[in-house]
């Protein structure tokens, strides 16, 4: 069974098109679950982000949705094997048709991001990476499940993130936090983490760099991830 060993849990990903990656680890580390009683993870994949948020909270109940069948079963197995399995519910569902009367205090997603991708020979990987619905559609769906003071956090490529930021006002949502993620010191950002809320607040801007000039994890990256990684070497 191939996968990734964290300090307190193991994520198997041999049946998933999208493997454990830095995007998921960043969102699971940075999204703010403070005071969240109910958390929703859209397109959970391996279940990584849901499990990370379970570790970071004392009692939050987490619902994780996944459409692709193989990934759904693997996310279920990963969640059942982790120390917080009594607080994670993995469901096979399409976010565009899923119905829920429950409202969530925090909604997170590392959504598909190739809006105009070329099809590969791996249909499972295509489903995981290619956007069937726009990121605006994902945000609109998320809004209906959000509590009045809740937050929605997405990680996206920079261009897609900027586009969604411009569109969010159409839903009456405010971007209250914006993280630029740089792979290495001196390089332009490759990813952004955006947090939206129906409540206005001045947008907080942050930058996080993963590697320093010596290819070691930066102190900032280490601070966010050290509770998860077995070994994190900072400067």
Curated annotation (Swiss-Prot):
Q: What is its EC number?
A: 2.1.1.223
| Cross-referenced CDD domains | AdoMet_MTases (cd02440)
Check the record and name the Pfam families matching this protein: MTS
- What's the superkingdom here? Bacteria
| Chemical reaction(s) catalysed | adenosine(37) in tRNA1(Val) + S-adenosyl-L-methionine = N(6)-methyladenosine(37) in tRNA1(Val) + S-adenosyl-L-homocysteine + H(+)
Q: List cystine links.
A: none
Identify the InterPro entries for this entry.
Answer: DNA_methylase_N6_adenine_CS (IPR002052), SAM-dependent_MTases_sf (IPR029063), Small_mtfrase_dom (IPR007848), tRNA_Adenine-N(6)_MTase (IPR050210), tRNA_adenine-N6_MeTrfase (IPR022882)
Keyword field contains Amino-acid biosynthesis: no
Cite a single GO MF annotation. Answer: nucleic acid binding
Q: Name one GO biological process term.
A: methylation
Keywords attached to this entry: Cytoplasm, Methyltransferase, S-adenosyl-L-methionine, Transferase, tRNA processing
Asked if the keyword Repeat belongs to this entry, the reply reads: no
Q: Name one GO cellular component term.
A: cytoplasm
Which compartments does it reside in? Cytoplasm
Q: Which PROSITE patterns match?
A: N6_MTASE
Q: Could you tell me what this protein does?
A: Specifically methylates the adenine in position 37 of tRNA(1)(Val) (anticodon cmo5UAC).
Q: Which family does it belong to?
A: Belongs to the methyltransferase superfamily. tRNA (adenine-N(6)-)-methyltransferase family.
What is this protein's name? tRNA1(Val) (adenine(37)-N6)-methyltransferase
């Amino acid at each position: 069974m191939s996968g990734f060993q964290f300090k307190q849990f193991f994520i198997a990903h041999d049946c998933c098109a999208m493997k454990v990656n830095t995007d998921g680890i960043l969102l699971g580390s940075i999204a703010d679950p403070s005071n969240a009683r109910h958390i929703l993870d859209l397109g959970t994949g391996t279940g990584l982000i849901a499990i990370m948020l379970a570790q970071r909270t004392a009692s939050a109940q987490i619902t994780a949705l996944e459409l692709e069948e193989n990934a759904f079963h693997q996310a279920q197995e990963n969640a059942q094997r982790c120390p917080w399995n009594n607080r994670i519910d993995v469901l096979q569902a399409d976010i565009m048709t899923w119905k829920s009367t429950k409202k969530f205090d925090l909604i997170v997603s590392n959504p598909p991001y190739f809006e105009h991708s070329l099809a590969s020979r791996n249909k499972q990987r295509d489903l995981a990476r290619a956007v069937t619905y726009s990121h605006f559609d994902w945000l609109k769906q998320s809004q209906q499940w959000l509590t009045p003071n809740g937050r929605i956090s997405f990680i996206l490529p920079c261009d897609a993130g900027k586009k969604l930021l411009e569109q969010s006002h159409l839903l009456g949502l405010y971007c209250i936090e914006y993280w630029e993620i740089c792979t290495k010191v001196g390089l332009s950002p490759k990813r952004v983490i955006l947090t939206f809320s129906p409540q206005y607040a001045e947008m907080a801007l942050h930058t996080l760099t993963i590697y320093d000039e010596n290819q070691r994890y930066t102190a900032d990256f280490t601070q966010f991830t050290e509770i998860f990684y077995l070994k994190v070497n900072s400067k």
